[in-house]
Regions:
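N-terminal binding-site loop/beta-alpha segment at the start of enzyme catalytic domains
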Residues: 1-97
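Short, flexible, mixed-charge acidic loops at enzyme active sites
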Residues: 93-104, 250-255
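Active-site mouth loops of central-metabolism enzymes
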Residues: 21-33, 106-122
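Generic structural signal for well-ordered alpha-helical scaffold segments
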Residues: 40, 67-71, 125-130, 174
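A solvent-exposed, charged loop/short amphipathic helix patch at secondary-structure junctions
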Residues: 101-111, 156-159
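An active-site-proximal structural segment forming one wall of the substrate-binding cleft
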Residues: 114-137
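Short glycine/proline-rich turn/loop motifs
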Residues: 19-21, 47-48, 104-109, 149-152
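Beta/alpha (TIM)-barrel catalytic core signal, keyed to glycine-rich beta->alpha loops juxtaposed to Asp/Glu
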Residues: 3, 34, 126, 130, ...
């Protein structure tokens, strides 16, 4: 799997970054053997493995599993980059189920609380490395879902305080980077405008878009922002490009089920029907189209893909190296399945 230089750093990143929410028991408690095999397959994909994780994933369980699996596989730390999204800290579980994202995480033995501030983010970073365990540390660091933290504000004053918390967290991360303790800092968010707001205030090395730059949704102002990042050597990772699986046949669109009595939701369902019909006509898998589109803008270095099945790890890597016929993209434009003036395909 080919690697691309990460902005102004000396690091190279592959076309696929491996997501790890399933290792933290998102929706399913996989056997340890399955989790180990998923990790084993990462190393079949290329020379350097980039792992995207977070303290929120299973209240730290994903970090523990990653560390245990890497040691079991005798992985070379020089060939592994762990990207840890910080902002949630493991705490004892004192209720029947975790208090964060009820119903999403299965079989957890700990809870997690949000800690976004200068001191809070350092606590999350230290705990994250402790959970990874001997031999491995997080080299890419970011604040986890700052858009949601800002959206929870109850007033303009509260939002300003929350932004100060976020900027305090980034001050701490920048100090770690400047000291050479981590190699790069970034931001990931479902709301790309929150990324743009933080980008104005923080010197970032990378950003991770989620649910934002997809075949279904690619506003021109976002493409302009990605171009601006590219000019400044800020690398873009793209993620959640299937809209929570909906564009490849899943039931949920952006983590919710559609209400077909709602006109906007009917439009989404109609889009998918027309998209699937075009894919069938050209003998294209919907996932192939979603991934090639997501990687097409200059500046998008990698795509984050995750799987609960070991055998899908390799197929995910193949998705990132598949080129579809130009005729497919031209017809997608003719059918208004993508912007007619989209410059990078068709």
């Amino acid at each position: 799997m080919a690697a691309i230089k990460l902005g102004s750093t000396t690091l190279n990143v592959p076309r696929v970054v491996f997501g790890t929410a399933t290792l933290g028991n998102l929706f399913v408690d996989l056997p340890d053997e399955t989790k180990l095999e998923i990790s084993r397959q990462w190393f079949e994909a290329g020379d350097t493995v980039v792992i995207d994780t977070a303290g929120k994933y299973g209240a730290g369980l994903a970090l523990e599993v990653i560390g245990n699996n890497l040691r079991a596989l005798k992985a070379d730390p020089e060939k592994v980059i762990v990207s840890n999204k910080l902002g949630w800290k493991r705490v004892p579980l004192t209720s029947d189920e975790p208090t964060f994202e009820p119903g999403a995480w299965v079989g957890l033995k700990h809870d997690a609380v949000q800690c976004i501030s200068y001191d809070g983010i350092l606590e999350c970073w230290k705990q994250g490395n402790e959970l990874l365990g001997e031999g491995f540390t997080s080299q890419f660091l970011s604040v986890h879902d700052p858009d949601e933290y800002l959206a929870a504000a109850t007033s303009e004053d509260d939002r300003a305080c929350r932004m100060d918390d976020i900027l305090g967290a980034y001050k701490a991360l920048a100090e770690l980077r400047d000291q050479g303790i981590c190699q790069a800092i970034g931001v990931g968010s479902k709301d790309w405008k929150a990324i743009a707001e933080i980008d104005e205030k923080v010197k970032l090395d990378w950003v991770m878009l989620a649910n934002s730059l997809t075949i279904y949704r690619h506003p021109q102002e976002l493409l302009d922002f990605v171009e601006s990042l590219h000019r400044r050597d800020v690398v873009v990772f793209n993620s959640a490009v299937f809209h929570a699986g909906y564009m490849v046949g899943g039931k949920s669109f952006d983590y919710r089920e559609l209400d077909l009595s709602n006109a906007d939701d009917r439009e989404i369902a109609d889009y998918r029907d027309r998209f699937f019909a075009l894919c069938e006509k050209h003998s294209v898998k919907p996932a192939q189209a979603c991934v090639e589109f997501a990687l097409s803008p200059p500046g998008v270095a990698s795509i984050a893909l995750s799987s609960s099945k070991p055998e899908r790890v390799t197929s995910n890597v193949l998705l990132a190296n598949t080129k579809l016929p130009e005729a497919f993209w031209r017809e997608a434009k003719e059918l208004n399945l993508m912007a007619r003036d989209y410059p990078f395909l068709g």
